[in-house]
Amino acid sequence: MPFFSYRATEAYLTGNKAAAKAFSLGAHRLNARVQELHRQAGQRIFDSRNTTIHPSTNSSNDHMVDLHGLHPTEAVEMLETTVGKLKRTGFKGRMVVVTGTGHHSRGQKAKVLPAIREYLHRVGLRAQEGTMSDGRGGMFTIQI
Protein backbone atom coordinates (compact mmCIF):
# COMPACT_ATOMS: atom_id res chain seq x y z
CA MET A 1 0.00 0.00 0.00
CA PRO A 2 2.74 2.52 0.74
CA PHE A 3 4.04 1.98 -2.80
CA PHE A 4 0.72 3.00 -4.37
CA SER A 5 0.24 5.91 -1.98
CA TYR A 6 3.77 7.14 -2.55
CA ARG A 7 3.39 6.87 -6.31
CA ALA A 8 0.00 8.64 -6.19
CA THR A 9 1.52 11.55 -4.27
CA GLU A 10 4.51 11.67 -6.58
CA ALA A 11 2.28 11.69 -9.68
CA TYR A 12 0.01 14.37 -8.22
CA LEU A 13 2.95 16.62 -7.32
CA THR A 14 4.31 16.35 -10.86
CA GLY A 15 0.92 17.29 -12.30
CA ASN A 16 0.02 13.83 -13.62
CA LYS A 17 -3.48 13.71 -12.18
CA ALA A 18 -4.57 10.65 -14.20
CA ALA A 19 -1.68 8.57 -12.85
CA ALA A 20 -2.30 9.97 -9.35
CA LYS A 21 -5.91 8.83 -9.52
CA ALA A 22 -4.94 5.38 -10.84
CA PHE A 23 -2.37 4.86 -8.08
CA SER A 24 -4.79 6.15 -5.46
CA LEU A 25 -7.49 3.73 -6.63
CA GLY A 26 -4.91 0.93 -6.56
CA ALA A 27 -4.08 1.81 -2.96
CA HIS A 28 -7.77 1.79 -2.01
CA ARG A 29 -8.37 -1.58 -3.71
CA LEU A 30 -5.33 -3.10 -2.04
CA ASN A 31 -6.37 -1.71 1.35
CA ALA A 32 -9.86 -3.19 0.93
CA ARG A 33 -8.35 -6.57 0.04
CA VAL A 34 -6.04 -6.49 3.07
CA GLN A 35 -9.00 -5.64 5.33
CA GLU A 36 -11.01 -8.53 3.88
CA LEU A 37 -8.12 -10.97 4.40
CA HIS A 38 -7.76 -9.77 8.01
CA ARG A 39 -11.50 -10.33 8.53
CA GLN A 40 -11.28 -13.85 7.08
CA ALA A 41 -8.26 -14.69 9.24
CA GLY A 42 -10.04 -13.44 12.34
CA GLN A 43 -13.08 -15.55 11.49
CA ARG A 44 -10.89 -18.65 11.04
CA ILE A 45 -9.17 -18.05 14.38
CA PHE A 46 -12.54 -17.57 16.08
CA ASP A 47 -14.05 -20.66 14.43
CA SER A 48 -11.09 -22.84 15.44
CA ARG A 49 -11.50 -21.84 19.10
CA ASN A 50 -15.30 -21.88 19.17
CA THR A 51 -16.67 -25.01 17.59
CA THR A 52 -20.32 -24.39 18.40
CA ILE A 53 -22.71 -21.50 18.79
CA HIS A 54 -25.60 -23.86 19.46
CA PRO A 55 -26.34 -23.83 23.19
CA SER A 56 -28.84 -26.67 22.81
CA THR A 57 -25.88 -29.07 22.48
CA ASN A 58 -24.65 -27.91 25.89
CA SER A 59 -26.27 -29.77 28.77
CA SER A 60 -26.00 -26.78 31.12
CA ASN A 61 -27.22 -23.25 30.61
CA ASP A 62 -23.68 -22.02 30.04
CA HIS A 63 -22.05 -20.97 26.82
CA MET A 64 -18.38 -20.13 26.41
CA VAL A 65 -16.74 -17.98 23.76
CA ASP A 66 -12.96 -17.73 23.42
CA LEU A 67 -11.60 -14.52 21.89
CA HIS A 68 -7.88 -15.32 22.25
CA GLY A 69 -5.78 -14.49 19.23
CA LEU A 70 -8.09 -11.85 17.80
CA HIS A 71 -7.44 -8.16 17.37
CA PRO A 72 -9.64 -6.04 19.67
CA THR A 73 -12.00 -4.89 16.91
CA GLU A 74 -12.36 -8.47 15.65
CA ALA A 75 -13.04 -9.71 19.18
CA VAL A 76 -15.79 -7.13 19.70
CA GLU A 77 -17.39 -8.00 16.34
CA MET A 78 -17.28 -11.74 17.08
CA LEU A 79 -18.77 -11.26 20.55
CA GLU A 80 -21.50 -9.00 19.20
CA THR A 81 -22.37 -11.59 16.54
CA THR A 82 -22.34 -14.44 19.06
CA VAL A 83 -24.56 -12.62 21.55
CA GLY A 84 -27.00 -11.83 18.73
CA LYS A 85 -27.10 -15.47 17.59
CA LEU A 86 -27.65 -16.71 21.13
CA LYS A 87 -30.47 -14.23 21.72
CA ARG A 88 -32.14 -15.19 18.43
CA THR A 89 -32.07 -18.87 19.43
CA GLY A 90 -33.76 -18.01 22.73
CA PHE A 91 -30.71 -18.86 24.83
CA LYS A 92 -31.13 -17.95 28.48
CA GLY A 93 -28.15 -18.54 30.68
CA ARG A 94 -24.63 -17.63 31.53
CA MET A 95 -22.06 -16.77 28.91
CA VAL A 96 -18.38 -17.00 29.76
CA VAL A 97 -16.21 -14.76 27.58
CA VAL A 98 -12.50 -15.58 27.61
CA THR A 99 -10.28 -12.69 26.53
CA GLY A 100 -6.90 -13.55 27.97
CA THR A 101 -4.75 -11.06 29.82
CA GLY A 102 -2.28 -10.01 27.15
CA HIS A 103 0.56 -12.37 28.02
CA HIS A 104 1.06 -13.11 24.33
CA SER A 105 0.59 -9.50 23.18
CA ARG A 106 3.35 -7.08 22.38
CA GLY A 107 4.39 -5.42 25.61
CA GLN A 108 2.52 -8.09 27.60
CA LYS A 109 -0.41 -5.66 27.80
CA ALA A 110 -4.01 -6.80 27.39
CA LYS A 111 -5.75 -5.37 24.35
CA VAL A 112 -8.81 -7.59 23.94
CA LEU A 113 -9.82 -7.44 27.63
CA PRO A 114 -10.30 -3.64 27.80
CA ALA A 115 -12.02 -3.59 24.39
CA ILE A 116 -14.54 -6.21 25.55
CA ARG A 117 -15.01 -4.43 28.90
CA GLU A 118 -15.82 -1.19 27.04
CA TYR A 119 -18.17 -3.00 24.61
CA LEU A 120 -20.10 -4.71 27.43
CA HIS A 121 -20.47 -1.39 29.23
CA ARG A 122 -21.53 0.43 26.05
CA VAL A 123 -24.28 -2.06 25.18
CA GLY A 124 -25.47 -2.40 28.77
CA LEU A 125 -24.56 -6.05 29.33
CA ARG A 126 -23.75 -6.44 32.99
CA ALA A 127 -20.61 -8.47 33.35
CA GLN A 128 -18.61 -9.87 36.18
CA GLU A 129 -14.87 -10.08 35.63
CA GLY A 130 -13.36 -13.35 36.66
CA THR A 131 -10.37 -15.56 36.30
CA MET A 132 -9.57 -18.84 34.65
CA SER A 133 -7.90 -21.68 36.56
CA ASP A 134 -4.51 -19.98 36.19
CA GLY A 135 -5.63 -17.11 38.42
CA ARG A 136 -4.59 -14.41 35.93
CA GLY A 137 -8.01 -13.03 35.04
CA GLY A 138 -9.00 -12.49 31.43
CA MET A 139 -12.60 -13.65 31.66
CA PHE A 140 -16.07 -12.13 31.88
CA THR A 141 -19.32 -13.79 32.87
CA ILE A 142 -22.52 -12.27 31.54
CA GLN A 143 -26.15 -13.27 31.88
CA ILE A 144 -28.16 -13.47 28.68
Locate each region found by the language model.
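Long, charged, low-complexity intrinsically disordered regions
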Residues: M1-I144
